[in-house]
Every structure is written in C-alpha cells, then in structure tokens.
Amino acid sequence: MVNTTIKTTKSQEIFAAAQNLMPGGVSSPVRAFKSVGGQPIVFDHVKGAYIWDVDGNQYIDYVGTWGPAICGHAHPDVIGALHEALEKGTSFGAPSFLENVLAEMVIAAVPSIEMVRFVNSGTEACMAVLRLMRAFTNREKVIKFEGCYHGHADMFLVKAGSGVATLGLPDSPGVPKSATSSTLTAPYNDLEAVKALFAENRDQIAGVILEPVVGNAGFITPDAGFLEGLRELTHEHGALLVFDEVMTGFRIAYGGAQEKFGVTPDLTTLGKVIGGGLPVGAYGGRRDIMSMIAPAGPVYQAGTLSGNPLAMTAGIKTLELLQKPGAYEYLERITKKLADGLLQVAQETGHAACGGHISAMFGLFFTSGPVHNYEDAKNSDTAKFGRFHRGMLERGVYLAPSQFEAGFTSLAHTDEDIDQTIAIAREVLSSI
C-alpha cells in the first residue's frame, strides 16, 4: 500500500487493474506518476478549477487537462453548446459551417495565420507542418531545440521534452536513424548554436521549429532577442520559422506567443485551447505556403475526424469566452500572484528555487537558476520536486506530475484558491 494521508483505495484498485489492460496502466506516460513517485489518482469528475477523484477527494487543479481548460473545467457555456451540437450528430466527415467560424476566429487572432487546416491533435499538426516545410523549401533538414516537444512522431523524438523527459529517455526505441537523420538540434536560447548549424548545412535547412515559450521541459522563457534572432536567421537563409503554439496559443495571449513577443513566424501549430477540451489540432500560416496543402496543392494530409462539429463547437465557445473584456488581465494577475507566492514561500523555507509565469502559464524549479534551457532544467532537484508534488497532492493541490511540465491557471481559479495553494505550499516546503 502507498503511504498517504488521503484515501486512495479505489484509485489503487482501478490503477492496478489498468496495468493489466494498458501499457503502464495509462493512455499517456506522464499520467503514471513515474517521475514523482507514489500512486496516480484516478479522476471521477471535474468542474471549474477543481477535480474529484474516485475516492471523493477534491483538489485545486493546476494541470487543466494539460492546457485546454483555460476557462475552467466543464464551463456551462461550453457544455450547453455541446449539448446542442450533439443533437445534430457527432461527426460529419464532410464540410461544416462550424469550421468556417472557428477558422475565421483563428485567422483574426493569430498574426501569422492567413489560412488554417484543422486536425485532431498537436502531434498531427506538427507532423503535417514538417512535411509542408520540406515541400515548400525543397529542403530536408529541420532544426529543433533540446527539450522542446512537438508530439510523438518519429522525426521529432530527438532530445524531446514532455513525457520523454519525464521518463529520462534520450530518444525512443523503434525510431529508425533514417527518420531523424535530417533533424538537427540546438540548445534553447542559444542563437550561436543555430548560426553554426546554418553555416554547416548551407542551403539544406528547411526551417526552425520551436516552442516559443517552452512548456515541455518545465517552464522556460525566451531570452531577450532570441525569437527575434531566429526570425532574422531564417530570413537570411531562406528557411521557414515555425512556432509550435499548441500550448501557448490563446493561453499567454489571445494571439499567442507571437502576439506577446511581437515576432511573426511563417507557420504555426495549435491545439489544446482551440478545442475547448476536445481532441483538436491545427496548423496555419502564410497563404502561399498553406496553398500547397491538398486538395489545393500537392502536399497530402487528411483526417477522418478533422474539423468534427463537437471540437469546433467547443473551440468557438471557448474563444468567445476569452474575448470577454478583462479575461487575460485576470489570468495575468492570479498567475503572477501564484508564481510569486510559490517562489517567496520556497525562499522563506530555505529552498533554492526559481521560476516565473507568463499570463496563465507558470513553472517552478528547485534550483537557484536561472533556467535557460533543457540542460539547466535537468540539473534542478527533481527528487525534491517529487516530494513537493506528493505533499501538495495529499493536501488537495494537483500539480503536473513531472518537473518537466508547465503549470496552468484558468478563469475559474479564484484568489481564495491561490491563497490556499500558497499556504499549503508553505506547509509542504517546511516539511521536506
């Protein structure tokens, strides 16, 4: 039995059975709590800023289903819209007006996007973008950054973040060398390394893809001039710049990181928030590039459930909620309060810590820092984070079960939630 102060009998029973049914007992690796130890909790239902497990325990949630729940779980407006949409059917496999509506909203919001294609996941969006980059430039090599995660497709599983970082895997078995031979890597925030790669591979690099704010190696922000430098380098070498905004899109600003930092890429991938909690992905960018996608052009990409009416409905309603005056000001205020409070408590209880936030995204590392890249993140005290995570969980706060994942707030979080979280963090950090 797990040593815990909360009742987890049903969670343990369900997870034990799950391990005989699914690899590791989960449908995605990080959910197994491997890097933080202890027993995963099994959810029963969610509402607003809170989750309840099958044993009846309630938690303040800072995972938000890994990002989509920016308006809070099961928002009544989203649920109401979905009920109406369900009456018309769950999937058409044909064009629907809802695709037009969400496409217009995305194009109006994201500076780089003149045309958009909807898919079913962030991984799918990044796979399609990679193919499109290579087709448009007629080049094969792509630069990615250590610790940046662009889904689980073969060509991106090179020094990746997210679950790969959580499990300590440098790469994944089963990925042939040929699949990654054209994937070049550089440390995040290191422009000189990128310059060297361009110099060594002149006229061979199709583009650069990155999380403009890293959320899959913990929360890491771009140094001043880094994004601008990438924009200049890609222009100079005839390569494309791609922002993977699956996590940051509509979260750190309505127009994403590119609006926040004033740097416009050529292509952008999206997901999470634009589906309002349903499976979704999207990629878009300049019209001349996107016009190469079939059936308008020769670059093939397709999907049975792409643009399905339920995901489109949830996405439309979520973006409507985010358009309300004061939404992002509120997210900035409560997230700053949380991030500053956690750092202050860590320092006052004698722990070396660093971290920060941008709008509704935050992170905390147990190291004096600063953390500029994946190597810095790996040098933080992950064992201490595991103890911190468990202590918070046992006292009713659900944080991402990995040091290498960002945290998320929502419009449903209240000042009382933040105050309670900081108070609990003080209690936990005073005891570890």
From Swiss-Prot:
Main location: cytoplasm
Any Pfam family the entry gives: Aminotran_3
InterPro entries: 4pyrrol_synth_GluAld_NH2Trfase, Aminotrans_3, Aminotrans_3_PPA_site, PyrdxlP-dep_Trfase, PyrdxlP-dep_Trfase_major, PyrdxlP-dep_Trfase_small
Enzyme Commission number(s) from the entry: 5.4.3.8
Keyword vocabulary terms for this entry: Chlorophyll biosynthesis, Cytoplasm, Isomerase, Porphyrin biosynthesis, Pyridoxal phosphate
Family recorded in the similarity comment: Belongs to the class-III pyridoxal-phosphate-dependent aminotransferase family. HemL subfamily.
Catalytic activity annotation: (S)-4-amino-5-oxopentanoate = 5-aminolevulinate
Subunit: Homodimer.
Pathway: Porphyrin-containing compound metabolism; protoporphyrin-IX biosynthesis; 5-aminolevulinate from L-glutamyl-tRNA(Glu): step 2/2; Porphyrin-containing compound metabolism; chlorophyll biosynthesis
Subcellular location: Cytoplasm
Modified residues (N6-(pyridoxal phosphate)lysine): K272
Coiled coil: none
Cofactor(s) needed: pyridoxal 5'-phosphate
Gene Ontology annotations of biological process type: chlorophyll biosynthetic process; protoporphyrinogen IX biosynthetic process
Example of a GO MF term: pyridoxal phosphate binding
Keyword Isomerase: yes
GO cellular component, one term: cytoplasm
Main enzyme class: isomerase
Superkingdom in the source lineage: Bacteria
UniProt-recorded name of the protein: Glutamate-1-semialdehyde 2,1-aminomutase
